[in-house]
Design a protein with these regions (language model features):
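Hydrophobic/aromatic residues within transmembrane alpha-helices
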Residues: 58, 67, 71, 114, ...
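Hydrophobic transmembrane alpha-helices of multi-pass small-molecule transport proteins
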Residues: 79, 146-168, 188, 223, ...
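Specific alpha-helical transmembrane segments that line the substrate/conduction pathway
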Residues: 66-77, 103, 108, 112-154, ...
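Glycine-/small-residue-enriched transmembrane alpha-helix faces in small-molecule transporters
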Residues: 2-66, 173-200, 219-225, 327-328
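Helix-helix packing/entry segments at the starts of transmembrane helices
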Residues: 68-70, 123-129, 197-220, 251-291
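Small-residue-rich packing faces within the transmembrane alpha-helices of Major Facilitator Superfamily
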Residues: 49, 73-77, 158, 192, ...
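Specific transmembrane alpha-helical segments of multi-pass solute transporters/efflux pumps
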Residues: 46-52, 80-127, 137, 163, ...
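Juxtamembrane helix-entry segments on the extracytoplasmic side of multipass membrane proteins
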Residues: 32-38, 61-65, 69, 88-94, ...
Length: 328
């Protein structure tokens, strides 16, 4: 009986030109996948960078609580079609629920309370401290090693954060707010807990997408319970199409689409390079605030922002492990 599979292998190996052609096709496909991966990660970073901008627009008609709830309801609608059947044990469900509580209602309510007080530019630059906070958290709680470059990046990011906060002024329109900046930074520490706990589940064999999506769904349920108990039903009538577009974009683009793009992209590109696209968020977010919302950045803020972004670039371009799945 003929064996087509084996015959094909012999035919290819017996003809160097065919073997070389097959190798060229494989290399071309890998190259295309890699560039598509870079594009997906970059687009995810761009979508994340617009989150504060859309939030400021929504605050014209919605409270912080109702905006965050609407954001995640739209995000859940955008991710429902990829929900996998959960395979968590009872213990893992408890771990996931703790992470979801920190990552969705706590982190995002604190973060957007901060945005309500400060400017888009300041909030975006504060988010730029996340790679450094994550590196320190992984060193402290997960036993990872932070080298000399990492500690220098930590020092630079801390100095930049201090410069931005110290340069805020309540008397200058568009100049930021100290309490708002601090709340955004505090939200990053809740995000740290969320990420580190999720990493435990991923190390136990669960995919980043499964952990991310189920964490988002359960976190949204917790968020809804809190918001409805504290603030009642969100408004539907009289909101205005401009606000609805901002809210929908915040959920569908900044959370659902960015999550899908990032989780696909990081599996197509070298792990040491994917993380650099996280730095699009603070840089582009600050530009959006200045150019579209009239934020005013003093010299201290410009210098501080440059230090934060430089520190994040140093960490993400020298990082050796693969960036984990993220949700924004």
């Amino acid at each position: 009986m003929a064996q087509p599979g084996r015959g094909a292998i012999v035919a290819v190996t017996d003809h160097p030109q065919l073997a070389g052609s097959a190798q060229t096709v494989r290399e071309h496909r890998r190259s295309v996948s890699r560039w598509l991966g870079y594009g997906a990660c970059a687009l995810a970073g761009i979508f994340w960078s617009t989150g504060f901008f859309f939030g400021k627009i929504a605050f014209q008609r919605l409270s912080v609580e109702h905006f965050v709830l609407y954001r995640f309801l739209f995000a859940c609608a955008g991710l429902l079609f990829i929900v996998e059947r959960p395979r968590f044990s009872a213990r893992q469900w408890r771990v996931l629920l703790i992470a979801s509580f920190l990552g969705i209602p706590v982190q995002f309510l604190v973060q957007f309370y901060g945005l309500k007080l400060t400017t888009v530019s300041h909030a975006a630059l504060m988010v730029g401290t996340m790679p450094v906070i994550l590196a320190v958290g992984a060193t402290t709680f997960a036993g990872e090693h932070l080298d000399v470059k990492g500690w220098l990046a930590l020092a630079g990011s801390t100095l930049g954060m201090a410069l931005i906060i110290s340069s805020t002024s309540r008397h200058v329109a568009g100049g930021g707010n100290r309490l708002g900046d601090l709340l955004v930074i505090a939200a990053m520490f809740f995000a740290l807990g969320w990420i580190l706990i999720n990493q435990r589940l991923m190390r136990e064999g669960h995919s980043p997408m499964a952990v991310t999506v189920w964490g988002l769904l359960t976190g949204t349920v917790m968020l809804a319970v809190w918001v409805l108990a504290q603030s009642g039903l969100p408004p539907i009538h009289g909101v205005g199409w401009r606000i609805w577009l901002a809210v929908a974009a915040s959920g569908l683009l900044c959370t659902a689409a960015a999550t899908l793009l990032w989780n696909w992209g990081i599996h197509q590109v070298p792990a040491s390079r994917a993380g650099v696209f996280l730095n699009i968020e603070p840089a582009l977010g600050a530009v959006l605030g200045v150019e579209l919302l009239g934020d005013r950045l003093g010299l201290g803020t410009w210098i501080g922002g440059a230090l934060i972004i430089a520190a994040a670039v140093v960490l993400t371009t020298t990082e050796k492990r693969e960036p984990e799945g993220l949700v924004g």
